[in-house]
């Protein structure tokens, strides 16, 4: 009972110390509000509401089909212009794509002459230019092939392909960006808060006080883990409900309590990593450099931004030992696909095992170095 009381009281001390750190409080609020909102609404790498202009010099049934095939959410409604206005519009940056459909286009297509359509792209808008060029090519080819097939043969196709988008019917990037921002910020803040809590002890000269008190390194470490983990757990839950579900209007398919249980297990592992890094760094700037070196690979290779199947096999095997890989997997399964515990229990068990391993390593390191931190 005395050990639990010591852990609780030391944790309260950590929370009070955090309340006096305005920089950390600002980082916490920013990470789960502005950062989440901007990640969800920023212009994505995929095509979204790209401005497009079309000079239809043919005015045929086929050219009208091509014009009407560009619609939201990939393109804004096409602006109809003349060929003479095309260069001026691109120079002024009014649209990213400008399409010139030549005269007699439909007649030449039906005659098998393979006419050309000119597509002008503003390549300075790199986020849309490369992807949009492929979209436009596929759309035009699809409309031309469909028109020619129906014109020459009025029979219905034997097979009709019906595509349905699961879990994100409108392919809205905000559904992915907002949730992934929360997942990444949970890992980042868990490491930063626990590591900085240890650095603060060194900078404020309170390590000596801890050494003369009847407490153990285990109690000190557990106090920092539960207090900083509780902060991240609470603010991430509020951000998921208020920002993602409320402000952004993203539907949450699965159980939020089940997701928060996964967050707690992930925090057990990542806060232990923060303690370990805090024993290595001698100051806040050093901790910041270590966080960059550790956090970037954890986030980039965990499967959140790039599918793990696209990575080399060796990288996949190495990342299986990291908690973020399993946390991203269970978070996406619960929040996107509505998975229950019967599906994500392997990730839960793996997080418990990885968390126990990181906690043991951090505790051994902490016991070894606490005397030299004074």
Swiss-Prot record:
Regarding protein family, the annotation reads: Belongs to the ABC-2 integral membrane protein family.
Keyword match Cell membrane:
yes
The regions listed as transmembrane in this protein's record are: 23-43, 173-193, 230-250, 256-276, 284-304, 343-363
One Pfam family per UniProt: ABC2_membrane_3
UniProt key word Transport: yes
| Primary localization | membrane
Provide the leader sequence positions: none
Q: How does it sit in the membrane?
A: Multi-pass membrane protein
Q: What is the superkingdom listed in this entry's lineage? A: Bacteria
Enumerate the GO terms in the molecular function aspect: ABC-type transporter activity
Q: Where is the ABC transmembrane type-2 domain?
A: 133-369
Query: Where is this gene product found?
Result: Cell inner membrane
List, alphabetically, the GO terms of the cellular component aspect.
plasma membrane
All ranges on the Cytoplasmic side of the membrane: 1-22, 194-229, 277-283, 364-374
User: Which organism is this protein's natural source?
Assistant: Escherichia coli (strain K12)
Q: Which UniProt keywords apply?
A: Cell inner membrane, Cell membrane, Membrane, Transmembrane, Transmembrane helix, Transport
Chain ranges on the Periplasmic side, renumbered to this chain: 44-172, 251-255, 305-342
What protein does this entry describe? Inner membrane transport permease YhhJ
């Amino acid at each position: 009972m005395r050990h639990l009381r010591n852990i609780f009281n030391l944790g309260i001390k950590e929370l009070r110390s955090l309340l006096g750190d305005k920089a950390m409080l600002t980082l916490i609020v920013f990470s789960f509000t502005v950062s989440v909102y901007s990640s969800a609404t920023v212009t994505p790498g995929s095509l979204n509401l790209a401005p497009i202009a079309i000079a239809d010099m043919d005015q045929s049934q086929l050219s009208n089909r091509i014009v009407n095939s560009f619609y939201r959410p990939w393109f804004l409604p096409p602006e109809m212009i003349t060929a003479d206005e095309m260069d001026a519009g691109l120079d002024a940056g009014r649209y990213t794509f400008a399409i010139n459909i030549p005269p007699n286009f439909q007649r030449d297509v039906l005659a098998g002459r393979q006419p050309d359509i000119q597509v002008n792209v503003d390549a300075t808008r790199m986020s849309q230019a490369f992807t949009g060029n492929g979209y436009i090519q596929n759309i035009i080819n699809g409309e031309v092939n469909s028109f020619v097939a129906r014109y020459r043969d009025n029979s219905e196709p034997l097979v009709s392909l019906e595509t349905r988008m699961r879990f994100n019917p409108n392919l809205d990037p905000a559904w992915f960006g907002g949730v992934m921002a929360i997942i990444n910020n949970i890992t980042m803040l868990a490491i930063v808060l626990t590591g900085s809590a240890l650095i603060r002890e060194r900078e404020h000269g309170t390590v000596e006080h801890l050494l003369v008190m009847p407490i153990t390194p285990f109690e000190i470490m557990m106090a920092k883990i539960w207090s900083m983990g509780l902060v991240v757990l609470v603010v991430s839950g509020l951000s998921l409900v208020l920002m993602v579900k409320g402000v952004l209007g993203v539907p949450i398919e699965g159980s939020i309590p089940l997701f928060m249980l996964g967050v707690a297990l992930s925090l057990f592992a990542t806060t232990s990593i923060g303690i370990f890094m805090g024993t290595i760094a001698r100051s806040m700037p050093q901790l910041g450099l270590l966080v960059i070196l550790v956090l970037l690979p954890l986030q980039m290779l965990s499967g959140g931004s790039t599918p793990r199947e696209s990575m080399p096999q060796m990288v996949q095997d190495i990342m299986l030992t990291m908690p973020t890989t399993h946390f991203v997997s269970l978070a996406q399964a619960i929040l996107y696909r509505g998975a229950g515990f019967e599906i994500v229990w392997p990730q839960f068990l793996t997080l418990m095992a990885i968390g126990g391993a990181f906690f043991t390593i951090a505790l051994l390191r902490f016991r070894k170095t606490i005397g030299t931190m004074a």
